[in-house]
Structure formats: structure tokens, C-alpha cells
């Protein structure tokens, strides 16, 4: 049944709130995120609902091997790290919803145009811009060239949409899922015009027939396409997976996409002996036994020798093991690959999100690809810290760099069973990523709540230091210090005594060693220097503001002592907040060039642009091709479509600078080991 369109944009806004990007540096958000991480790490393992799912529900295995279109082709879409700000999330949902996209490549391989089918047919002699997707210059150039739709590569909407983790931010509440995910996707594809239905599942195929679901009177085999499958990321796990299971595992529809799974992991049999597996790694933990048993049974009893596997996991552990020098989590993934996939199958492609950019690694032979495509709507992550080479365990002897030598030691053979992955492509480009990192300089302007918090902390620290200065130097009151002459040469002498005052000492240690604890560069020196810089800045601000307000040459509020004291503390909040948060921004920029704390350097900016998703295609010969689609600038203005037909989006782009997608690196044909 088609979702009824609201009568007006106002009616839509009364049902869904179009959320902005999350202010990750807002004090309340920082506290909430920190508590979520701590509580999840403490209780997450003890509240593992994956085993409960196995006890209550049959495993989610579905057969799409006979679901090709009339040309014998099969399409599916992949997107990850999705529901944050409306503009970025809806921009990607809008593109996913289009029935067909058209590309044309130049000789250089760069994308020249990306058009929606209706726009190609609506080009007029006047060159009028249709649906606001194309610029005037592009329309004129296309009209003058006389090119036709046949000159473009046609990219169809997937019959399946895979959401690869972190479907909502910052927390997986019912309200956040509704506003940040359901609203944008329902508006983008409220229904599907003339929806196709998969052929009945055959008894003899790999996956057994799916029984009638307890929550629905409609048999699974009769559910219209497209279908939706999801795996949870760490943000989906913050409530123990409660909201995720309610939304994605009970047969609900999200716009025109129909959910089917009943667990947080699934297996899909695709045409031409391709499989897609989606695994649930919880919080970087090992796979639970019921999940391993589920995939083991499929691999042993349902897969044929040589079947090709696309593996979807919520986190690119292959990257993190290189960045953090900790391979524990990646070892869990490798063990799953070696013990379950590789005995019968061939792992060809691994997809992940978690890092909010596009980054592809491939082996020297090109027979294994690992792609991070976390550009579904969340704030941008850096790319210039991505390692150039990765040395990883091989899944299957055919992928190892060398065969084990008979006379070699165990350690030598272990090294020989490694395979090198090279960084093939990133989006945004590394030079762009470095430039965007400089935006952290604007932290006090982009995050006024954080600046206010820093200012209040500076004011409190200043008051404690002045009290300590008074007591340690024999003064009775704070006013005695205010009336005294604080010369520059006294700042580092008598204030040194103030730092020995109990409360001042506690606060100083809290600042210095608190920031040292979060340091990441060479014995955490970056954090230590950062903390010392804040202490020195606060002392210098005290001297400057006292001199400005209470020196003999002060021009403000003479004979108004209490008002001048009040003014001093207000100035400390405002000036200290600005300079203190600016110091944090400077620290993050410096760290970005040291390739540390990059998550914070980009989180403080909440950049909505440089988004991406993948469109996968299996042709009639069984060749898998990946189309990585990127958007440099998401649309910021939208126009309500009051007369949207069935299958049409409720909001259309109204921003010539936004929603202009392109192929990030052209079409990527996946090579097989024996080809």
C-alpha cells in the first residue's frame, strides 16, 4: 500500500522533524556520548541480544538467485553511516530512490554527466533546468551536443538495499530513528510504482523456502521489491539493539523499502553463485556462537565449492589494525573468514562503513577488494590518514604472497601467508581532506556551546587561582589581589605558589593529566602540551584582564569595584571561551597533520558534504561491477512537490550546487582469483 503524501510541507514537518547535523562538541552531547560508550563497554557483553535472537527466531537466509530483470541482470545498493542531518541523509536517499541514473565518461574516465531518466526526456530547446539537478551550462552543453540516452551508461535502482551500520545518530531512540532515518527515506521513496515481485523460492535452491512470518499475513515470497537488509553499527547497539530489532526485524516498511530479516545478521543468495553475508560484530566483539553456527551451516550445506562471497561488516577492522597497531578485532574477522568462508567459498569483496568516507584497498592481483563506504549522511571523516599499504592475513592459499616453504620456520611461514593491500582510491582526495582539516580553526565559531563551556571552566579556574594567589601570598581577600599590581614578571613566580593551593592544584592536575590521558602521539606528549598550554593561557588571561580592569590607567567603571569584578568574570567567560576553544582548534589542526585525533578534528565541524554510496551490478554472465557514487556538495535547499505521483519523491532539489553526483572512480569490475 502506498504511503499517503501529506497535504503540505507543513503537515510533513508536523510528522517528522528535519534535524540538523549533530553538534558533537556540545557539552551535553559530549557527556551523553561518553556515558553511552562507557555503559556500552561495561554492560554490552552482558546484554548481548544476538543469542536471544537465535533462541526466538529462525535465521534470515533469502534466495534472490532467480530475481534477475528481463536482461538477466541484478542490481543492489549499499549505504552506511546514514541518519544524521536532513540535508545529507535526504540527498543520498533521494538518489537511491531514483529508478535509473545515467552516467557518461570522458576519455579520462571522469564522470561528465549524471542524469535521471526523466530529466533526459524533459530537455527542452530553451535549455530550462528540470528538477533542479543540472546546471544551466550542463543542460545547454547536452542539448547542443545532440547526445541521446543511449550514449549513457544506465544505472538501475537496486532490488535490494543494504544498510551497513550506524543507521542513526547520535543515539538509537525511537524518535531519532523516526526523524533522522524513516522521515528522509519515506519522503524520498514513499512507494514503488509497479513494484516487482521475486519469483517463488524453489525447494531445491540453497536457501530453504521462507515460512510465513508470524508478524504478517503476507508471505515473504510475495513481498514487492525493493527489499531492505541492515546490520547494526556501534550507534545502533547503544540501547542493546532494542530499537534496531523493533524497526528492522519485524517486517516493517521504510518508505518503499520492505524489511525482511528477523535477526541482526543475514545471508542472501544472489544470481550466478554470488552470496552476500551481513554479520553483526556488536562492539568489536567476536561473533556469537549462534551467528557462527548460522553461517557455518550455510557454508557447509548450501554453498557450492567456489561460490563468491560479498561480506558486509560494520567496521573496517583492516584499517583500524594498521592505525591503532592492535589487530585483536581484525583477528576475529580473519578467523571468521578462514574458518567459515574460505573452505568452500571465495571472499572477493568486503564492504564496511564506520569511517565516513570512501576508501578502497585491493590486492596486487586485484582479486580481493576491501571498500569503506560510510558516506550515507553522517559527518565527514578524513582520508589523508589512510595507510598506503596494508599487510593482512590471506583468506585462502591462492591469495597468499608465497606458498609456505618446507624448510622455513613457523614464524617465516606466518609472514609468507600475508597479502599486501594497496590503497587504490579515496574520496574526498587527500589534499582536500587536509584542507578541510584546517576548518577546526573555526571551532569557537562553529561550536558556541563548546566555547561557552570552555569559558565557564576558565572562569572557575581563574577564581580558584586568584583565591590561591591571595591565600598563598598572605592576602585575606580576593579584592586585595584585584587592587594589587600584577606585573608580567610576577605571573610565573607568585602564581607558581598559587598552583600549590589545594583546589588550584587539583584543577591544574585535572586539566594537564586529563588531556595527557587522551593524547595519542609519542608518550602522549601532545595531550600533555595541550594541557599545559591551557593552564598558561588562563594565567595570562588573568593577568591581562586584571590589568585591563583594575590598573591605575583603567578607564571603565571607576569607583564601581563590584561591577568591575563582575565585568572581569564576564570577560573571562567570553574571552577565555573564545581563546580556549580556539586553542583546542589549533591543537586539532596540528594533530591532523600528525594524523592523530582526526575524528575530533572533523567531528567539531560536522561537515555534511562528500557523501557516497555503492551500486552493485551482476550481469547476465555473472560479472560483478561496483559503481561508487559520490556527491561533493549535498543539497541544502528543497522544494515541496505537492503533486508527487506514485513512486516520486516528496521533496525535489532546489539548489543548483547540491545533489550533483558523480562516479568516484568509474565502474569497478571485480576480478575473480581464477580468472
Mark where each language-model region is.
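Conserved beta-sheet core of the metallophosphoesterase superfamily
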Residues: 230, 326-394, 580-611
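Active-site environment of divalent metal-dependent phosphoester hydrolases
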Residues: 85-87, 169-172, 235-241, 284-287, ...
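Acidic, histidine-bearing metal-coordination/catalytic regions of metal-dependent phosphoesterases
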Residues: 1-162, 168-232, 236-238, 242-272, ...
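Active-site neighborhood of phospho(di)ester-bond hydrolases with catalytic His/Asp-centered motifs
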Residues: 79-80, 159-166, 227-234, 279, ...
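Active-site-proximal segments of metal-dependent phosphoesterases and phosphodiesterases across multiple
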Residues: 283-293, 302-348, 444, 449
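Membrane-proximal envelope and lipid/glycan-remodeling enzymes
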Residues: 308-310, 320-325, 335-336, 369-371, ...
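Active-site-proximal beta-strand elements of phosphoester/diester hydrolases
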Residues: 73-84, 273-283, 310-314, 368-376, ...
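A short, polar/proline- and glycine-enriched secondary-structure boundary/capping micro-motif
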Residues: 287-290, 381-383, 635-641
Amino acid at each position: 500500500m502506498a504511503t499517503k503524501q501529506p497535504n503540505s510541507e507543513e503537515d510533513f514537518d508536523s510528522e517528522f522533524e528535519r534535524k540538523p547535523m549533530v553538534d558533537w562538541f556540545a557539552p551535553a552531547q559530549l557527556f551523553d556520548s561518553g556515558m553511552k560508550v562507557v555503559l556500552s563497554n561495561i554492560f554490552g557483553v552482558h546484554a548481548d541480544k544476538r543469542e536471544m535472537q537465535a533462541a526466538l527466531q529462525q535465521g534470515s537466509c533469502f534466495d534472490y538467485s532467480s530475481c534477475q530483470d528481463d536482461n538477466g541482470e541484478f542490481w543492489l545498493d549499499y549505504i552506511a553511516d546514514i541518519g544524521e542531518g536532513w540535508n545529507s541523509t535526504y540527498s543520498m536517499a533521494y538518489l537511491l530512490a531514483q529508478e535509473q541514473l545515467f552516467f557518461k565518461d570522458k576519455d579520462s574516465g571522469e564522470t561528465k554527466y549524471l542524469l535521471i531518466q526523466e530529466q533526459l526526456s524533459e530537455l527542452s530547446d530553451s535549455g530550462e533546468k528540470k528538477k533542479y539537478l543540472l546546471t544551466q551550462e550542463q543542460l545547454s552543453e547536452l542539448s547542443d551536443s545532440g547526445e541521446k540516452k543511449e550514449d549513457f551508461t544506465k544505472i538501475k535502482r537496486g532490488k535490494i538495499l543494504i544498510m551497513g551500520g550506524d543507521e542513526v545518530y547520535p543515539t538509537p531512540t525511537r524518535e531519532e530513528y523516526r526523524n533522522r532515518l524513516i522521515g528522509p527515506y519515506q519522503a524520498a521513496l514513499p512507494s514503488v510504482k509497479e513494484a516487482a515481485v521475486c519469483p517463488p523460492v524453489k525447494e531445491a535452491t540453497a536457501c530453504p523456502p521462507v515460512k510465513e512470518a508470524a508478524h504478517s499475513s503476507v508471505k515473504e515470497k510475495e513481498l514487492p521489491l525493493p527489499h531492505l537488509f541492515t546490520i547494526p553499527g556501534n550507534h545502533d547497539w547503544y540501547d542493546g539493539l532494542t530499537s534496531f530489532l523493533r524497526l528492522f526485524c519485524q517486517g516493517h516498511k521504510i518508505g518503499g523499502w520492505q524489511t525482511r530479516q528477523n535477526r541482526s545478521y543475514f545471508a542472501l543468495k544472489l544470481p550466478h553463485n554470488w552470496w552476500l553475508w551481513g554479520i553483526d560484530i556488536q562492539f568489536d566483539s567476536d561473533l556469537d556462537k549462534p551467528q557462527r553456527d548460522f553461517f557455518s551451516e550455510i557454508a557447509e550445506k548450501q554453498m557450492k565449492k567456489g561460490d563468491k562471497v560479498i561480506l558486509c561488516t560494520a567496521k573496517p577492522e583492516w584499517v583500524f589494525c594498521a592505525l591503532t597497531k592492535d589487530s585483536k578485532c581484525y583477528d576475529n574477522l580473519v578467523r571468521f573468514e578462514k574458518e567459515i568462508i574460505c573452505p568452500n567459498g571465495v571472499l572477493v569483496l568486503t564492504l564496511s562503513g564506520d569511517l565516513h568516507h570512501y576508501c578502497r584497498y585491493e590486492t596486487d592481483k586485484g582479486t580481493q577488494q576491501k571498500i569503506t563506504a560510510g558516506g550515507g549522511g553522517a559527518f565527514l571523516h578524513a582520508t589523508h590518514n589512510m595507510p598506503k599499504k596494508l599487510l593482512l592475513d590471506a583468506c585462502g592459499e591462492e591469495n597468499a604472497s608465497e606458498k609456505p616453504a618446507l624448510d622455513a620456520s613457523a614464524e617465516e611461514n606466518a609472514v609468507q601467508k600475508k597479502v599486501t593491500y594497496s590503497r587504490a582510491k579515496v574520496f574526498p582526495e587527500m589534499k582536500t581532506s587536509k584542507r578541510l582539516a584546517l576548518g577546526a580553526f573555526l571551532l569557537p565559531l562553529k561550536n558556541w556551546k563548546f566555547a561557552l563551556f570552555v569559558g565557564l571552566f576558565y572562569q572557575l579556574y581563574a577564581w580558584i587561582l586568584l583565591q590561591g594567589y591571595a591565600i598563598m601570598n598572605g592576602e585575606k581577600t580576593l579584592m586585595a589581589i584585584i587592587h594589587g599590581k600584577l606585573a608580567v614578571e610576577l605571573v610565573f613566580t607568585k602564581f607558581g605558589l598559587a598552583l600549590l593551593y589545594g583546589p588550584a592544584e587539583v584543577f591544574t592536575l585535572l586539566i594537564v593529566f586529563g588531556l595527557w590521558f587522551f593524547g595519542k602521539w609519542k608518550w602522549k606528549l601532545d595531550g600533555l602540551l595541550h594541557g599545559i598550554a591551557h593552564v598558561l593561557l588562563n594565567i595570562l588571561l588573568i593577568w591581562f584582564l586584571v590589568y585591563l580592569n583594575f590598573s591605575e590607567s583603567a578607564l571603565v567603571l571607576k569607583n564601581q569595584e563590584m561591577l568591575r569584578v563582575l565585568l572581569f568574570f564576564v570577560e573571562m567567560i567570553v574571552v577565555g571561551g573564545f581563546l580556549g576553544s580556539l586553542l583546542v582548534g589549533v591543537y586539532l589542526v596540528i594533530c591532523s597533520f600528525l594524523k592523530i585525533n582526526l575524528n575530533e578534528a572533523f567531528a567539531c565541524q560536522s561537515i555534511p558534504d562528500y557523501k557516497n554510496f555503492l551500486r552493485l551490478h551482476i550481469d547476465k554472465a555473472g560479472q560483478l561491477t561496483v559503481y561508487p557514487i559520490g556527491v561533493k556538495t549535498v543539497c541544502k535547499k528543497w522544494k515541496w512537490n505537492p503533486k508527487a505521483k506514485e513512486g516520486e519523491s516528496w521533496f525535489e532539489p532546489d539548489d543548483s550546487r547540491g545533489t550533483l553526483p558523480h562516479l568516484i572512480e568509474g565502474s569497478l569490475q571485480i576480478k575473480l582469483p581464477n580468472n
